[in-house]
């Protein structure tokens, strides 16, 4: 048997999905430990209960509304931007050592061996990944209505950045373009080129002025991703969306900067690139967000009060089903980490959360009795409190069993049909327990 739970601190509610492997039925409800190393159902949760919990957790995680239904994760993951985030996701889970269940249609820990993995996540990316809370990707909008450029050799790209939350601080933004020398005109290391990204600005007599942002050097035989810094452009677009006229990509020979060459000649941004092409150009934004786990006080109190009232009205439909449960079960085991599994699928989130399908959250449970052993990770204060409790048990309580170390949970999800986000929720997974 497997048991999975969802803990919601603001409601003090535990939702557990319990599946028997030899049957085809699944029940959702509240399960508790009966003190004899057995997990038993205390009561069944109705569909309304689960919907209530789902809304509460969305608010708890700082997601304003449930993203729209997405038909196929597999189709979207063929695109370049989601593939990048999927690699980032697996890198984070590997470093955190998370016990996470992932869907079978994308259960890979790295890109295919024939792909240029070594330059897909750079050292600069790794630092930005570690420091950021939210990573957003943006694909080029091919159908955006813009004026044609007079520069026939380069390419113009445009990204819709209107969905970025205003309270997120931009750390860095990168443009990724793929070079495939096999499709180019020059395929030798003797040919060196400079690729430059420009921000398109309007003003004056010229309809579009080119403001250089960054450049990168490459060779004619290079195959892989090129990274260009576009932080200034994304920052300006967020301040004033009317200034978002896109960017322009140009290239020239290293020894002839005055002569622009066709990007096709060095295998860059081919005109026949499809929307779902895994080498489609994309932009990455690394952000530091506010505390992602929202406070349980303030403006949301009224909403929770209404839902709690609704929960009380529905309680008659979900009364205890096990008459052998004693409400005053005392856990006599010493403080230790217990298994707790969160299942997103039972909340109906499998159509917009790409990964994970579920994760091990764990929890701390048990007594902090004298003497406090080494495995209890007791603080000095807890040791003193235990001794005082022996002398004055009615005045001073025993120390509490609580997490001593917590880990982050990465969640990869569809914002809409065009954009995929990766959020890191800190302090979501118990790593160790102790007496405090």
Swiss-Prot record:
Pfam families assigned: TGF_beta (PF00019), TGFb_propeptide (PF00688)
GO molecular function: cytokine activity; growth factor activity
UniProt propeptide residues: 28-317
GO CC entries: extracellular space
Disulfide bonds: 335-401, 364-433, 368-435
This protein's UniProt keywords: Cytokine, Disulfide bond, Glycoprotein, Growth factor, Secreted, Signal
Biased composition (Basic residues): 301-316
Glycosylation sites per record: 102, 114, 217, 229, 377
Taxonomy, superkingdom: Eukaryota
Localisation per UniProt entry: Secreted
Matches recorded under PROSITE patterns: TGF_BETA_1, TGF_BETA_2
Primary location class: secreted
Segments for region (Disordered): 293-322
Secretion signal span: 1-27
The protein's assembly and partners: Homodimer; disulfide-linked.
Family: Belongs to the TGF-beta family.
Identification of the protein by name: Protein 60A
Species, as recorded: Drosophila virilis
């Amino acid at each position: 048997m497997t048991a999975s739970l969802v803990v919601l601190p603001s409601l003090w509610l535990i939702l557990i999905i319990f599946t028997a492997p030899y049957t085809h039925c699944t029940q959702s409800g509240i399960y508790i430990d009966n003190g004899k190393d057995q997990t038993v159902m205390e009561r069944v949760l109705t569909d309304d209960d689960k919907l209530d919990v789902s809304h509460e957790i969305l608010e708890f995680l700082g997601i304003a509304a449930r993203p729209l239904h997405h038909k196929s994760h597999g189709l979207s993951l063929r695109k370049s931007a989601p593939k990048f985030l999927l690699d980032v996701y697996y890198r984070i889970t590997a470093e955190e050592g998370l016990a996470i269940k992932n869907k079978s249609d994308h259960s890979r820990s790295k890109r295919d061996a024939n792909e240029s993995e070594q330059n897909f996540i750079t050292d600069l990316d790794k630092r930005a990944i570690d420091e950021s809370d939210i990573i957003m990707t943006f694909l080029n909008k091919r159908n955006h209505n813009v004026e044609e450029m007079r520069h026939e050799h380069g390419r113009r790209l445009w990204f819709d950045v209107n969905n970025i939350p205003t309270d997120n601080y931009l750390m860095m933004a990168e443009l990724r373009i793929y070079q495939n020398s096999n499709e180019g005109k020059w395929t030798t290391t003797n040919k060196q080129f400079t690729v430059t990204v420009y921000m398109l600005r309007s003003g004056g007599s010229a309809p579009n002025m080119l403001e250089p942002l960054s450049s990168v050097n490459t060779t004619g035989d290079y195959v892989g991703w090129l990274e260009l810094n576009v932080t200034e452009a994304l920052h300006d677009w967020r301040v004033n969306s009317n200034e978002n006229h896109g960017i322009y990509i140009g290239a020239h020979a290293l020894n002839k900067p005055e002569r622009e060459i066709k990007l096709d000649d060095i295998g860059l941004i081919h005109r026949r690139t499809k929307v779902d092409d895994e080498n489609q150009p994309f932009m990455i934004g690394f952000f530091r967000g506010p505390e992602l786990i929202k406070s349980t006080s303030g403006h949301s109190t009224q909403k929770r009060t209404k839902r709690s009232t609704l929960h009380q009205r529905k309680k008659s439909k979900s009364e205890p089903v096990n008459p052998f449960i004693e409400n005053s079960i005392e856990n006599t085991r010493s403080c230790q980490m217990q298994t707790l599994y969160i299942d997103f699928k039972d909340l109906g989130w499998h159509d917009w959360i790409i990964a994970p399908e579920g994760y091990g959250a764990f929890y701390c449970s048990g007594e902090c009795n004298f003497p406090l052993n080494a495995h209890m990770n007791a603080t000095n204060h807890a040791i003193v409190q235990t001794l005082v409790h022996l002398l004055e048990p009615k005045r001073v309580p025993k120390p509490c069993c609580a997490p001593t170390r917590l880990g982050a949970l990465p969640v990869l999800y569809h914002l809409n049909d065009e954009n995929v986000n990766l959020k890191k929720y800190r302090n979501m997974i118990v790593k160790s327990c102790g007496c405090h």
